[in-house]
Amino acid sequence: AGYGNNLNEIIDSVKKIIPTGIVGINIEDSIDLNPVLIDEMEFCERISAIRALSDSMGFHLVINARTDSFYTSTGSTQEKLSESIRRGNKYREAGADCIFVQPVWEKETIATLVKEINAPINILANPTIGAGVTPSISELQDLGVARVSLGSGLMKATLALIKKVANELSEKGTYNILLDTLTPLPDAALAYKMTTRMKDSP
């Protein structure tokens, strides 16, 4: 997802982004979370082609292959788990560095994924998706998870804060939420420096 609708488009996209200095990409086996996933052999071909491209450029691009088996609308939880494991191992064999399975939050399920997939496992830390809350970082570490992604969580939290500030300003004419967020002052100063640095970057 995000790189093109066919192999040629995907390779063309990756060719363009490697020179920017990136160290890795995320590639998904669904399109717009369609309940019908991309055929696993076709997806493996995409991974292998990306790996061959990065190798030909003398650069090891980290490929984080995401399977959306748990998003599919059909099948039991066990069937989705089995498909995630099967796809994860296939993607690893095709050249992926790590496997991203989401949304999962049950400790037993996560432990099974770590045990059965022969690759570092990536979990989404985002309680806004699904019915459960992802275990803490220390708990995920104990389960053997190698990488935690915040996904769109940071942006959603930022937009929610902006909405709260705007509502207070509109309804009460006060700035308490904004001022509380910018306290202590050193944090506010650091945030300003980060913002101006991003603005001035090429």
Question: Predicted segment positions?
Answer:
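Extended, intrinsically disordered, low-complexity segments
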Residues: 151-202
